[in-house]
From Swiss-Prot:
Keywords: Coiled coil, Cytoplasm, Membrane, Phosphoprotein. GO terms for cellular component: cytoplasm; extrinsic component of postsynaptic density membrane; glutamatergic synapse; neuronal cell body; plasma membrane; postsynaptic density. Residues 302-515 form the DUF1170 domain. Residues 545-558 have a biased composition (Basic residues). CDD domains: PDZ_CNK1_2_3-like, PH_CNK_mammalian-like, SAM_CNK1_2_3-suppressor. The keyword Coiled coil applies. This is Connector enhancer of kinase suppressor of ras 2. The gene is Cnksr2. The keyword Membrane applies.
Length: 1032
């Protein structure tokens, strides 16, 4: 501003006096006082009511007039470089919240009398005035171009005006202060919401651009011509240009546009002046005038003027002002605007906005004729103006010059004027295409920059109710139309050949949002387009994306999980995490360990690091990541989505959890808007095999998926190069014990506990169909091999019953025999892997190698198969699930570290099998490890009646155990011969619930003495210690 005009703070006393000469007539009497006191510009900006009174301005109204004009100077001096729509919205939002805080603070005070008083305090009214002042500053921007021409900003302006009027009405109502405050609180909250909406439009360049000053010189002014500007003055002294007369000096300079604010005339600041004084200053020098204009943001194009500029009338979003009778200071314009409206044309005054023409702007060629015959047919019956008669004829040459400035791929925003035209009329010929459409104001959320297309804007394009049209050449449209068709066929999985481009494209635009597809169909079918004005856009990238979205049904089956961990590559963060499964039943295992990989704001999890397909994935930008305090699992966090589902994860250590949370939040912050998924099925995907997680479901007899969960020889496992990097803990499949589900097989540990499971190759992995087709062995069992056929070991054993054959083939029934008797002996290379002493469920799909063992199993006493043997004994306390899993995992690792392979006879195998099955040589059930306790608790029978009885028995045993503990507590007191009153009082306070239960059970045995016993109990709790001793 220093290069254009001198700051107000550096004004001399003479400049202050010159400025005051243009103020209201009633203030001219005080100029001599200002001149006598030599008030400088800095003093003027800081002047107060008291100083004005010292200068002889005694009337409050005169003081307010001066202070309002000074406020305008302060805004010009201090806020020019920082003032924009966003900062003004912040100020209004702050004023509204300050008023809310003021009201809530008054109500918290002890001397609040708002329910009885009807007089608002002065400081309250001051806050209301400040709020309205902040709203006026915002409205000063919204009430003029370019914001007034945008529907969204126009609606916002009307809302702010309505709320301010409501606020002034509420203050003047006759009601209690409490009622007034409630109404004002509602208004303030609504205003805050409006401001937040404006602030949220940060992508709109009009919101964040500040105003700037520009000096314009108009010379060679003819006395009969005038300047040709239309100016509207606000009541507080702002002068806004609303339009120009065509072919006038203001029009020819091409620098004066609607919405510009006049700051200086011939280097004399006119802010706060009366309108007549401004007009006199403009006419002071007949040869020319130098104007300093404050120009608000118009567009992002700095290389050429914005297409919005040089509008001749008030925007359509605002109602035109009806000119009143001119005053003595109003001059008649030297040239009038011919407006082909239904009203009679009349000479409009310089200081008012002319009404808009009925027809939209139609560009013309050099001869002043319309360039297209279609437009002649369209405008039949209406007057057509040529040359300078057109209200915007200056745009004809300028628009032709400006058209080639923007590159071919630039998005141009145009105004579609053609109404009711058929598709044959709307198709483009080989004629020049520059004169079809007239660009007007940029809609909200869009900018004029063509080199860079923000992905956020591309995403919003598909959701806007009004789309935008890109105006392009014939060849470009044909090319993009072909790409649209090719991509549509590509997405449906069909091949298409390139078609030859035709000279006349069947359609010159395409509607992007689904809301506008009806209009497109009508254009293609040849039906007239509805008489509505639409904004359209044509973007090649968005068009292809739309095509993919429409045809997604054909490729939706292809999941993002079909990528191996190796092909996924190294992620931004990876490691072992626990994942909580959906609880299918009370007895199902809730947490399972997976290998997680964070890649490009997507989280994948695999069974191990060599898995060929992800077990699941989620798109993190769609989810909210936070700590999961509601989980009992330590170091748990969650990914929540209000409309889909929530996922729960847990880390081993606090540092791991913090590392994952930091990485996820850092990655999703950048992808939250750019990579948002369009379809809900892309938010997440998970393996379907977890659906059959409970034996009570109809899928309980279905075989598990052919994943690698079978044991393998030590030579193969120990040579595995895939070792978990950070923790020497069991891998996900090693620590995830098999529950009552059929698909969760336990990964057997063969070497060190740090060895990760190995993904089986296709030759080593066999499906259940292959197993069914496998020939039976001599024992009548399918041998479920985990190695190639030549490495498998078959044994000759006696045949068993079909029931036992089924139990050895399908894992769902394995709890009836092998959980009690132990696993069948395996081949020599595999035997020691299963017999690992971890208390987990033995494997049920291997072949018995000793017929004597079968005979023993078939002749075992019935008590060994009693389901009650599976019940958890009362002497072992129930612990949290996660603690048991960790303890069991450590126990498994310790027992497998020094495991040695030994060859033994059938008797040794039988003894070890009984030991692993937690059975004594006599067939009695014997508990060995903590995991065994847990497994025995979750074992279930297919008979629901038996399950209910077992559950009842567990309840009784748990109750008995609790009672035994209570009896032990009571015996401790009764067995103390030196018990004192103080000790008993302490004991009673510590076990008050137990004491009350004892008293209640005692009184229930004798109904006749209930009242007396209750009285004694009550008095025993309240009286002295001596009475308590007597009562005991």
């Amino acid at each position: 501003m220093a290069l254009i005009m001198e700051p107000v703070s550096k004004w001399s006393p003479s400049q202050v006096v010159d400025w005051m000469k243009g103020l209201d007539d009633c203030l001219q009497q005080y100029i001599k006082n200002f001149e006598r006191e030599k008030i400088s510009g800095d003093q003027l900006l800081r002047i107060t009511h008291q100083e004005l009174e010292d200068l002889g301005v005694s009337r409050i109204g005169h003081q307010e007039l001066i202070l309002e004009a000074v406020d305008l100077l302060c805004a010009l001096n201090y806020g020019l470089e920082t003032e924009n729509l966003k900062t003004l919205s912040h100020k209004l939002n702050a004023s509204a919240k300050n008023l809310q805080n003021f009201i809530t603070g008054r109500r918290r005070s002890g001397h609040y009398d708002g329910r009885t008083s009807r007089k608002l305090p002065n400081d309250f009214l001051t806050s209301v005035v400040d709020l309205i002042g902040a709203a006026k500053s915002l409205l000063a921007w919204l009430d003029r171009s370019p914001f007034a021409a945008v529907t969204d900003y126009s609606v916002t302006r009307n809302n702010v005006i309505q709320l301010c009027l409501e606020l002034t009405t509420i203050v003047q109502q006759d009601c209690t202060v409490y009622e007034t405050e409630n109404k004002i609180l509602h208004v303030c909250k609504t205003l805050s919401g409006v401001c937040d909406h404006i602030i949220s439009l940060s992508s709109d360049p009009l919101v964040s651009q500040s105003a700037h000053l520009e000096v314009i010189q108009l010379a060679n002014i003819k006395p009969s011509e005038g300047l040709g500007m239309y100016i509207k003055s606000t009541y507080d002294g702002l002068h806004v240009i609303t339009g120009t007369t065509e072919n006038s000096p203001a029009d020819r300079c091409k620098k004066i546009h609607a919405g510009d604010e006049v700051i200086q005339v011939n280097h004399q600041t006119v802010v706060g002046w009366q309108l007549k004084n401004l007009v006199n200053a403009l006419r002071e020098d007949p040869s020319g005038v130098i104007l300093t204009l404050k120009k608000r943001p118009q567009s992002m194009l700095t290389s050429a003027p914005a297409l919005l500029k040089n509008m001749r009338w008030k925007p359509l979003a605002l109602q035109p002002l009806i000119p009143r009778s001119p005053t003595s200071s109003v001059a008649t314009p030297s040239s009038t605007i011919s407006t082909p409206t239904k009203r009679d044309s009349s000479a409009l005054q310089d200081l008012y906005i002319p009404p808009p023409p009925a027809e939209p702007y139609i560009p013309r060629d050099e001869k002043g004729n319309l360039p297209c015959e279609d437009l002649r047919g369209h405008m039949v019956g209406k007057p057509v103006h040529k040359g300078s008669e057109s209200p915007n004829s200056f745009l004809d040459q300028e628009y032709r010059k400006r058209f080639n400035i923007v590159e071919e791929d630039t998005v141009l925003y145009c105004y579609e004027y053609e109404k009711g035209r058929s598709s044959s009329q709307g198709r483009r010929e080989s004629t020049p295409t520059y004169g079809k459409l007239r660009p007007i104001s940029m809609p909200v959320e869009y900018n004029w920059v063509g080199d860079y297309e923000d992905p956020n804007k591309m995403k919003r394009d598909s959701r806007r109710e009004n789309s935008l049209l890109r105006y392009m050449s014939n060849e470009k449209i044909a090319q993009e139309e072909y790409m649209f068709q090719r991509n549509s066929k590509k997405d449906t999985g069909k091949k298409s050949k390139k078609k030859g481009d035709k000279s006349n494209s069947p359609a010159h635009y395409s509607l992007l949002p689904s809301l506008q597809m009806d209009a497109l169909r009508q254009d293609i079918m040849g039906t007239p387009v509805p008489e509505t004005t639409l904004y359209h856009t044509f973007q090649q990238s968005s068009l292809q994306h739309k095509s993919k979205k429409k045809n997604k049904g054909a490729i939706s089956g292809k999941s993002k999980r079909r990528i191996s961990c190796k092909d996924l590559g190294r992620g931004d963060c990876e490691g072992w995490l626990w994942k909580k499964k959906d609880a299918k039943s009370y007895f199902s295992q809730k947490w399972k360990k997976y290998w997680f990989v964070l890649k490009d704001a997507s989280l994948y999890w695999y069974i191990n690091e060599e898995d060929e397909k992800a077990e699941g994935f989620i798109s993190l930008p769609e989810f909210k990541i936070d700590r999961a305090s509601e989980c009992r699992k330590k170091y748990a966090f969650k990914a929540c989505h209000p409309k889909i589902k929530s996922f729960y994860f847990a880390a081993e250590h606090l540092d791991d959890m913090n590392r994952w949370l930091n990485r996820i939040n850092m990655l999703t912050a950048g992808y939250a808007e750019r990579e948002r998924i369009k379809q809900e099925q892309d938010y997440w995907s998970e393996s379907d095999k977890e659906e059959a997680d409970t034996p009570s479901t109809p899928k309980q007899d279905s075989p598990p998926p052919p994943y690698d969960t079978y044991p393998r020889p030590p030579s193969m496992s120990c040579a595995s190069p895939y070792v978990e990097a950070k923790h020497s803990r069991l891998s996900s499949t090693e620590t995830s014990q098999s529950q009552s589900s059929h698909e969760e097989f336990r990964q057997e540990v063969t070497g060190s506990s740090a060895v990760s499971p190995i993904r089986k190759t296709a030759s080593q992995r066999r499906s259940w169909q292959d197993l069914i087709e496998t020939p039976l062995t001599s024992s009548g069992l399918h041998y479920l091999q985990t190695l190639p056929l030549e490495d498998s070991v078959f044994s000759d054993s006696a045949a068993i019953s079909p029931e036992h054959r089924r139990q050895s083939t399908l894992p769902t029934q394995k709890c009836h025999l092998q959980d009690h008797y132990g696993p069948y002996p395996l081949a020599e290379s595999e035997r020691m892997q299963v017999l690992n002493g971890n208390g987990g469920k033995p494997r049920s799909f291997t072949l018995p190698r000793d017929s004597g063992f079968n005979h023993c199993c078939l002749n075992t006493p019935v008590s060994a198969c009693d389901p009650q043997d599976d019940i958890q004994p009362p002497e072992v306390e129930e612990e949290e699930e996660e603690e048991e899993e960790e303890a069991a995992g450590e126990n498994v690792g310790e027992k497998n570290e020094n495991r040695e392979e030994k060859l033994g006879d059938s008797l040794q195998d039988l003894y070890r099998a009984l030991e692993e099955a937690s059975l004594s040589p006599l067939g009695e059930h014997r508990i060995s490890t903590k995991m065994e306790y847990k497994l025995s608790f979750i074992k279930r029978c297919n008979d629901p009646v038996m399950n209910e009885k077992l559950h009842r028995l567990r309840i009784l045993k748990s109750t008995l155990k609790a009672r035994e503990g209570e009896v032990a507590i009571i015996d401790k007191v009764l067995d103390n011969p030196d018990l004192t009153s103080k000790e008993f009082q302490q004991w009673k306070q510590m076990y008050l619930d137990l004491f009350l239960d004892i008293c209640q059970s005692t009184t229930s045995n004798d109904p006749l003495s209930i009242s007396s016993e209750v009285d004694v109990l009550t008095s025993s709790l309240t009286h002295t210690h001596s009475y308590i001793e007597t009562h005991v």
